[in-house]
Amino acid sequence: TSFLTGENVPFYSQGTYYATGYSTFEPTMGITSTDNIYFTSYGNGPAGSTAIVQCTNMIEMTSLSDFSCQNVYGPFLPVANSNDPYVYVDPWTDRIMKFDMHALGGMTVEWSDDEGDSWVGPSLATGYSVQDHQTIASSPYGGILHETLWVFCINGNYPAPLCSASQDGGLTWGPELPGAPVDCQSGGLSAHIIGAENGNFYRGQIGCDGTGYSMYKTDDGAITWTEHVLPTEVSGTADTWNAEEAQVDTDSESNVYAMWMGNDNMPYFSYSLDDANTWSEAIMVGPSHLEGTGFPVVIAGDPGKVAFGYVGTEGDGVWHGYISVITDAFSPSPLITTVQVNAPDDPLDNASPTCGYERCGGFGDFIDMQIDAYGRPWLSLSHNPSGDTGIMGTLTNGPTLLGNVTSLSPLPIGGTQTLA
């Protein structure tokens, strides 16, 4: 009997990218319900601040001339450029949160509730020194004075990440508390935190005993955290610049999806249907012709529908961008469809043969990924040969990751013609 039944069926799929016209570094991104895409552009805002670039009419466009990108961060007193630029869009309220780390000495948050037309803040997010590798998310856990709870985690002077919560939408922040169980020795570096529909927050990194990867969960608003070990016995774990990271996302029903790089530098995936308490057997999700991958990120839509973003190489010294899609992750034999977002003669990096294993051009430490309201994944990347240009990789054709599995409406091919 064929396993290609139900939602586990093939769709014609093709990848492309669209250049934004702005350089980037560690390109985090978000999408609002008005179909605007936002991403960070290091140093290109007013007075040398981090720009928050808004791309309009890119989602569901029919012609390349439809979309445009511009900076929308322009407060009267802009915050100085961030050492680690970061933007996050609250999926439940559309609040655009700009989260800046300043020379390892502290962090500020600013936000916009009107698509970047006006900005509130900055507010001080921490009173401690030596802060790095910050990450922020929200969930409908419910703040006391705001409809969503906000949590950030950082790498500080502690054996595990330190995390803080805001009950009022980012105006004030509670004390930084350990983001792991007592006596955890995971180190402070971790992947991005995410908030689930059921109010849980998750963050992936090295296990408390210093081995493997684990998922860390809080169900009480970042007061306490529990460790949930991922099934890395077969895959092993990467030994690269970002080896500490296990990426995570949740679907519309709060099922949990984890992604990490194995000791073969290939991407692996597992899911949990019980709040990270147990995990499925891990599977490798990258195409077999790749010899190595890096900068993993995962995003989920409705249950079983998940996309993975990463860069990869065939061993020829150049690196490309990839999106792998699964429309029925719970199938005994899930079909994995992978597209390359750039043409073979248009690599995303051709200067470093080990780009995916190190801090590399505009990729920095990480990339980001989101799903729009139509079920299409968007992957924020850097086009290093053109000067670290921020680009949005996506599917011109392929399956939707929301609702019944059908074909996405086609988008025009982008690529190098959008770099001009």
Regions found by a protein language model. Give the residues of each.
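A short beta-strand segment in extracellular, disulfide-stabilized domains
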Residues: T418-A420
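Extracellular, repeat-based ectodomains that mediate carbohydrate processing or recognition
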Residues: T1-T416
